[in-house]
Amino acid sequence: MEVKVKKRVVVGLSGGVDSSVSALLLKQEGYEVIGLFMSNWDTIANFENNHEFNKTHQGCESELDYQDAQAVAQKIGIPLYRVEFIKEYWDNVFEYFLSEYQKNRTPNPDILCNQFIKFDSFLNYAKNELQADYIAMGHYARVKHDRNSSFLLKAIDTNKDQTYFLCNLNQNQLQNVLFPIGHLTKLQVRAIAKKHGLITANKKDSTGICFIGERNFKTFLQNYIPNQPGQIINIVNNQIIGHHIGTMYYTIGQRKGLNLGGMNERMFVCDKDIDKKIIYVAPSSFEKQYLISTQALIENINFIEPYNPQIPIMVRFRHRQDLIIVNDFLPIKNTKNVLINYESARAITPGQYAVFYQNDHCIGGGIVSKTNIGHQKVDFLVYKS
């Protein structure tokens, strides 16, 4: 990246190695770099009362990250500020997350976190309060700017590529963003951090829900959604074979944690009836019938750039999943929805995101509404009118 005039970049410094190296590289390239640490979750204000995290760590995980961010900022020689977007996160990300689980869908809060927090609230704060020309994040992605448009490209490190989580960004957001490590592999990023003595060089990658972190998922949800016990039924013979404490804790394709003993075959979750509080399971030998789909209705698609009908479209339903060929991409008139036919995919669930690619470009994504998995077949012709 050439820097003809000194531009101010505000980096989302999280206390992790990726954002640390992003800030370092920008400083080396001649930018005026400012670090900004976000706090977006408050365990007390957000009524998270029964998790071991509160009992043993007393909310210090975020503080430890902040201390690492401070150490990195001092080492690099940049100022570091701190900002809270707790209300914005609750209103735009977490309430949606809860509502989707109450509907027994499988949401992806990381996508909304990027859309509304990292690349909206953070961007606006950096622009308005810190007079930033750009913001930068430690995402494994690339952005290409031309005179009229910006394009989101896959990272060089395909195993770490995070464009899936950026599918809801718009042109205004991308035009103001830099991704300094998108051309590097994770090993290279750690090597750079180690070479320059950054405290985060060997720090493990963060996991769990965006800005909330690692939690026992059932225990965490119980803070906000009451248990709704019900039956587990074998869909093949309609026999009751177990019981559960809530359908929202299980996802399509799940095999672990079903607590079903004495079965001749391993069972997997294939459907859920919210009204009757039933989880349907099937034996592994029925996977093709009850888990494989070839067609889906995708709703509320965000296009980062217009798709080119002459270039093949690929889809990814999960982060790090292999790209799947889309045989038919059929926009539905007067909607932001599209019907897609694709090479077979396993355990695609309503609420997940379908993210579309053409060559190295991530062109956008939308939410899976329905699929044609076995017993869930839908007459999609109705959507073409």
Swiss-Prot record:
Chemical reaction(s) catalysed: S-sulfanyl-L-cysteinyl-[protein] + uridine(34) in tRNA + AH2 + ATP = 2-thiouridine(34) in tRNA + L-cysteinyl-[protein] + A + AMP + diphosphate + H(+)
GO CC terms: cytoplasm
Pfam families tied to this protein: tRNA_Me_trans, tRNA_Me_trans_C, tRNA_Me_trans_M
Record keyword Transferase present: yes
Region (Interaction with target base in tRNA): 108-110
Enzyme class: transferase
Xref: InterPro entries: MnmA-like, MnmA-like_C, MnmA-like_central, MnmA-like_central_sf, Rossmann-like_a/b/a_fold
Site residues by UniProt (Interaction with tRNA): 139, 352
The EC number(s) this enzyme carries: 2.8.1.13
Family: Belongs to the MnmA/TRMU family.
Function statement: Catalyzes the 2-thiolation of uridine at the wobble position (U34) of tRNA, leading to the formation of s(2)U34.
Protein name (Swiss-Prot/TrEMBL): tRNA-specific 2-thiouridylase MnmA
